[in-house]
Amino acid sequence: MLLPVFTLKLRHKISPRMVAIGRYDGTHPCLAAATQAGKVFIHNPHMRSQHFSTSRVFQSPLESDVSLLNINQTVSCLGAGVLNPELGYDTLLVGTQTSLLAYDIYNNSDLFYREVADGANALVLGTLGDIAPPLAIIGGNCALQGFDHEGNDLFWTVTGDNVHSLALCDFDGDGKSELLVGSEDFDIRVFKEDEIVAEMTETEIVTSLCPMYGSRFGYALSNGTVGVYDKTARYWRIKSKNHAMSIHAFDINSDGVCELITGWSNGKVDARSDRTGEVIFKDNFSSAVAGVVEGDYRMDGHVQLICCSVDGEIRGYLPGTAEMKGNLLDTSVEQGLIRELSQKKQNLLLELRNYEENTKAELSSPLNEADGQKGIIPANTKLHTALSVNLGNDAQDAHAELRISTSNDTIIRAVLIFAEGIFAGESHVVHPSTHNLSSSIRVPITPPKDVPVDLHLKTFVGYRSSTQFHVFELIRQLPRFTMYALTSPDAASEPVSFVNFIVVERAQRMVTWLNQNFLLPEDSNIQNAPFHVCFTSLRNGGQLYIKMKPSGEITVNTDDIDLAGDIIQSMASFFAIEDLQVEADFPVYFEELRKVLLKVDEYHSVHQKLSANMADNSNLIRSLLVRAEDARLMRDMKTMKTRYMELYDLNKDLLNGYKIRCNNHTELLGNLKAVNQAIQRAGRLRVGKPKNQVISACRDAIRSNNINTLFRIMRVGTAPS
């Protein structure tokens, strides 16, 4: 139970997810939040007489205890914490789409300012792995960077897509923090420094992550889903029609275990049990919640949960006291038991009513009436499921097919399928019309990504005249590479792109991997090495060849570098391979990347020219303005008018130049994203240490602008000595 202890109403709007709290003088906790017009406000109710008078910070004209920090750019992320332990107080970190600012509020000075080409969408501050100093870690355009208090770039790696959320958590229980990364490609990745140690695939963009305790962490998605993971196992999740704006871990009932606090877009704040997701506490704001943080804001020795709304309302809550703990827990347990027993009672009453109706129907109906009208089916009725590949036709695209059938003359009235990431809304209902009922149903399935998916099936079985149906529930797993059909090898269509590596495994184990990950026909006969199998993608018709020699050498031919990476990662997981070096060549993809790198150089060159032109125009504006004012003071109106007309034209040129700069920057970001993704893809072709070496060597090659070395690294995994 949370107890409200204070409410503030600031006359400043707060940007969603842009709230941080810190002791910027080492003593007093102050709230910082991004507000309108590229500013950050600092609310300091403890020292109302303190005024700032520097170029960057100024007193708010609306409130005496609020100071404004001028960023002059749209703020994209905000954080606070100890970046330099020697200072003894917290640093404010402000990220934009082009830079990162570490600001020392106590001394009103920049700790450092860094241009960040990949932007800063998310930010977290803390210690990562064995890297000794605290880092300000930012996630941007497919890249992760970590800076120390001097602005030195001590950590860099790439990830699969644009980063939306970051958190530090001891994921593997080794006493050191790992980095959790949520991105646009729906994945949560766990980095142990620059090595990916785990990946969890979700159903939407991961917008928020927060550590809870140990290896447990909370997450939120852009579709209104929130939940809790413990390592790679999901404990629970719930989905709302509203969006989760902010999540935070806080112990509201003094039981030593943090609950998941969620602030929603409709203004609701709720606290959920980390074990079950059950709502323990809720409150409401009049507008959307902007952020949830914690701190001793009243300086009374008690930590409060602090919730902020986008309209500037701030509320502080205290957790329930230890004396209340027993009563609260007892009440919660009792309520849970009552709910559970009530649900069981309802289910039993419903089942009893069905039996009574069947008995009445049996007594009132003639003895020769079909049993189907009574909702009765044979006791030995079984439900069979089979997965196969359908190559499609003119009316329907190629797809995977789930066939559900009964073992006798009963019919299937409806099928409910629950599966993550395949159907809109994560569920699909097949409900044939009355004249199309049969004992068999075929359901087309088209997974958008190559990931294994559990299909949870609920099948309603009865007779045509039945008004009640038996529900068969079962789970069927969709293999990872379902969307690939086994075809006959054709040397003419074999892709020129390949990856080549050696595994110390028997051919039978390789065949087992194929059977687990592909939908192979029952009559396929793959026995011993050497063997050669060919698949065709149902999505785009691309070819995939997998060859294995008796020596254990495996060659995978495909023009899709992402597919090659998925296959290698799948094999590494199945065969428990820790380190795998690979030789790879993707001529078409590498040529496209070469063009992208040339474009990046061009855009950088254009950016420098535009910046130089803007600087020249700025100097010219100062000169024209002085001349125009001189002419005005001398009452030379003709000259003044001429100068102001020149200023007007120059201003138009500046605006046009700004639009060109914006377009150039957008194009540059798109190409930098492609470069970062290329490095990520080259890394995914390897496993373990070779993977980390490739990513690091690729970055060094790009820094030195050595394109030929970059492609050699991507091909063979190492730079030339």
Swiss-Prot record:
Entry's localization field: Cell projection, Cilium membrane; Cytoplasm; Cytoplasm, Cytoskeleton, Microtubule organizing center, Centrosome, Centriolar satellite
InterPro entries: Bardet-Biedl_syndrome_2_prot, BBS2_CtH_dom, BBS2_GAE_dom, BBS2_hp_dom, BBS2_Mid, BBS2_N, BBS2_pf_dom, WD40_repeat_dom_sf
One GO CC term on file: microvillus
Main location: membrane
Keywords annotated in UniProt: Cell membrane, Cell projection, Cilium, Cilium biogenesis/degradation, Coiled coil, Cytoplasm, Cytoskeleton, Membrane, Protein transport, Transport
Chain segments annotated as transmembrane: none
Annotated function: The BBSome complex is thought to function as a coat complex required for sorting of specific membrane proteins to the primary cilia. The BBSome complex is required for ciliogenesis but is dispensable for centriolar satellite function. This ciliogenic function is mediated in part by the Rab8 GDP/GTP exchange factor, which localizes to the basal body and contacts the BBSome. Rab8(GTP) enters the primary cilium and promotes extension of the ciliary membrane.
Full protein name: BBSome complex member BBS2
Source organism per UniProt: Rattus norvegicus (Rat)
Species lineage: Eukaryota, Metazoa, Chordata, Craniata, Vertebrata
Gene that encodes it: Bbs2
